[in-house]
Amino acid sequence: YTNALDPWKKLKIASEKNGTPEVFALAQILKISAWHKTLESFGPMPYSHAADATMNIPFDSEKEVYTAMFEELTAAIEELTEKAENGVNVMGAYDAVYAGDATKWVKYGNSLMLRLAMRVRFADAELAKKYATQAVNHSIGVMTAKDDAAQMSQGAGMTFRNNIEWLAGNYNEARMGSSIFSYLMGYEDPRLSVYFLPMDGNASYGVEAFDGKTYQAVPAGHANAQNDIYKSCSKPNIQSGTPTYWLRASEVYFLRAEAALVWEGFGSADSWYKQGIDM
């Protein structure tokens, strides 16, 4: 939340000064990308007046924040759609996500709108349906291909290190927990070796799994602190160059499947779900 606030405010001021609303459109999408996670984690939050120069910032309700996010996404998508239709590259030299491809940003914005719509459907079905419909029926639409994914790895002359790998490798704090291990073992889920690395061949501890490899999970209830117990357990199967994903086409297909289950006019839930798996 706080890390996104200052850059967003600077881009807002710069775009107004330079007459570049498309830059502010990108800033809005990035802000919502970060702040919707804060909203879902903590509930009511400062939003509409978050950047005001005052010590007394009011909190907005969850409904107010979601409503504002939908409206801001709509405006940002509209601005970038015009640029996409005219083949305009938006800040390509500084864009580490899509290299200035306005069409990709519109797809991401619409996909983010669909995600938010499906997250509010139990609280406000009418609002959810309105913006889910708007997202999928947009002229450019939502993500449909793997290369539509919003992710950080390399771009704009920069290389990014995966933050989970950094925590696992440098701080020895990100390890496999006993709950996920129990589920994966119980169902003999082949994703076990995709998600986590087996123990070193010289390890004298661990549990042999159905795939013939040995894993060790952090015991349930263990103290959340850096220590040798964490260090000795199975790491996430993530490398330094593994992209950090914000949103992928596979999630969008699953969201469309969910929408199709509850509303008419959203296609086949079965078809969307299978496409999500294939993606």
Language-model segments: residues:
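Structured, solvent-exposed acidic/aromatic patches
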Residues: Y1-M279
